[in-house]
Amino acid sequence: MSRDTKTETADEYQVVVIGGGAAGLSAAVTLGRALRSVLVIDAGEPRNAPAAGVHGFLSRDGIDPRELLDMGREEARGYGVDFIAGVAVAARSTAGAEEGAELSFDVELADGRTVKARRILVTTGLTDVLPDIDGIRERWGRDVLHCPYCHGWEVRNKAIGILGSVPMALHQTMLFRQWSPNITLFLNDVVEPTDAEWEQLAARSISVVEGKVESLAIQDDALRGVVLASGTVIPLEAVVTATRLEARSAVLESLGVPVVEHPMGVGHHVEVNPMGGATAVPGVWAAGNVADLMGQVMASAASGVMAGAAINAHLVAEETRLAVDVARLSSLAR
């Protein structure tokens, strides 16, 4: 494969992508097809690993999450992309202080290795911070769910309980009512509906249970219901809960990229330019759930493509500027 090799050594790449999910792999394919030298550092911890399938992904609906990533890695390798299995813990700028200096970075891995990059794309995703209720973590991604567009079809017409872990539970309740007429909202000593919301719940024939949820009732490796603090068991086939969404932002923070509270109050994320994912730090991009907490897999993949194209354009601009500088010096030397 023909490729500009001016900056390529065993540990130096034009672009280092940190995170090997849908966003990172899509960016890697885009950059590989642009003849860029690309390294993907992947910790192997996809957010959707507990789920049986990926949904809402055109032509791949229901595919196992790991199979989708395997396919993405194979495609990226076909364009010369390299991979490291490991965890990036920090990065720092190594560019000179003089005006017009080329951007460059060192990326540090947990095992002590360091790789060099001209540009960095962070696609490390987010962590779902689950409510502290017995059974939630064990059933997460199976019959404890959060997104109707990811899981609603699979639990259609079933007995679904909405756990009042955050005020947004009312919004989730109304959404999931589209998939099932058998919806129960558990206020859980957290949610306090307004008069208008009580009216909406009644109009949609949604049951409301007061009191704190103590645990999930699980039998034969299946959810059977929720257990209230009073000991009452409410039979259910699925539980919906909102999570706090926390961007995996350690590398970005080490570079000085600010991490801020999401406008909807659902967690922390990184603000980026919507036209390509550039962060506030020159030479550093972010894509996928680390920037878009609400994005589904296909949206994350799309943001990776956009970021890859933006990074390539940024490199082209720098290379053109440097070529002009060389040409000017050459003409002066004649």
Please report, for each region that a protein language model flagged, where it lies by residue.
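Beta1-alpha1 glycine-rich phosphate/pyrophosphate-binding loop at the start
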Residues: 13-67, 159, 164, 168-191
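A Rossmann-like FAD-binding core segment of flavoenzymes
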Residues: 70-108, 114-117, 180-268, 313-334
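A conserved FAD-binding loop/helix module that cradles the flavin
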Residues: 28-29, 170-172, 287-334
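FAD-binding core/adjacent interface of flavoenzyme oxidoreductases
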Residues: 2-16, 83-158, 238, 266-275
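N-terminal glycine-rich dinucleotide-binding loop that anchors FAD/FMN and/or NAD(P) in oxidoreductases
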Residues: 33, 37, 43-45, 52-79, ...
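Short amphipathic alpha-helical segments
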Residues: 28-30, 52, 132-135, 173-175, ...
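FAD-site-proximal beta/loop scaffold in flavoenzymes
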Residues: 3-4, 138-154, 245-298
